[in-house]
Amino acid sequence: MGDYNGIGPEVTIKALQKIDYEKSIPVWIGYKSVFDFYHHKLKGQLRVREISACDDAKPGFVNIFELGHFGKSPVINPGKIEPDAGKAAMRAVETGIDLCLEEKTDALVTAPISKEAIQLAGYNVPGHTEFLAQKTDSKQVLMMLVNNGLRVALVTIHEPLKEVTSLIDKNRIINRLIVLNNSLINDFGIESPKIAVLGLNPHAGDGGVIGQEEIDIIAPAIAEANEQGITADGPFPGDGYFGTRMNEQYDATLAMYHDQGLIPFKTLSFGKGVNFSAGLPIIRTSPDHGTAFSIAGKNKADDSSFLAAFQLAENFIENRKHPV
């Protein structure tokens, strides 16, 4: 469902009008009243049924897994940041995680949440990825952005920039490379993946003139990953790497921090990219955009990214059934 005051319900409903119902049985986790509110606004024609257990889900329908209303129906205020909406969004995510862990569902596709709203609701996590890691007790979770052959993963995620340098260490990079390599094989079906690693400093340190991290930390991490059988190259300067389309020579790119990876990714893929959490015991994807409160409830949201997230989750399910 996502934050019901954002564009989450809208993009899910729009995407559910385009999926292949012979391939998947969708279970929409949230409030039926929220679904009905936006379905009516969008003049949707979906066949809908309410369920209390995934065993009751039927093909050809949007099966709504009702959460309950905390004793009252939610008051929907499109565009507003509210704790009740944040709490409901996280409750839906938590339910989805549990259903996947119990193998009642095969994958989880999350709609956008508001980091501010979930904080107001008492959830002290910076985002989906960290919450998923906590709930599944996963120690090595990798945030990866995907658009067809463009795949960008991150060493650090939602940390302030001033803290990034202290978080870049050899073991962290090696662990990220291991998770990334395994995901490229098991989720994407790439038999012998090639990974590029970006530097931390401008011009990848320029031989130590603009920082030592490339020499002291990143290059040794790459060398050790190579010794473990992972094909990884670098560190490459972050600015020229994407500009020269060097990324097209690799199956994935490992960036050191959030904006280093996501600015070029979204420049090349905005509205079409997918956020994937590698390293979890479950499959989880999401669109690469946020709640977009400014256009919520106005039938202006583009569902392309959510649809891509749904279809990528379908691909991962099949790839895990038929490993390379």
Enumerate the language-model features and the residues they cover.
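Contiguous, glycine/small-aliphatic-enriched amphipathic segments in soluble metabolic enzymes
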Residues: 1-128, 171-256, 260-266, 272-283, ...
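Glycine/threonine-rich beta-strand-loop-alpha-helix active-site module
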Residues: 120-142
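Short, flexible loop segments at boundaries between secondary-structure elements
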Residues: 135-150, 278-294
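Ligand-binding beta-strand-loop-alpha-helix segment within the catalytic cores
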Residues: 145-174
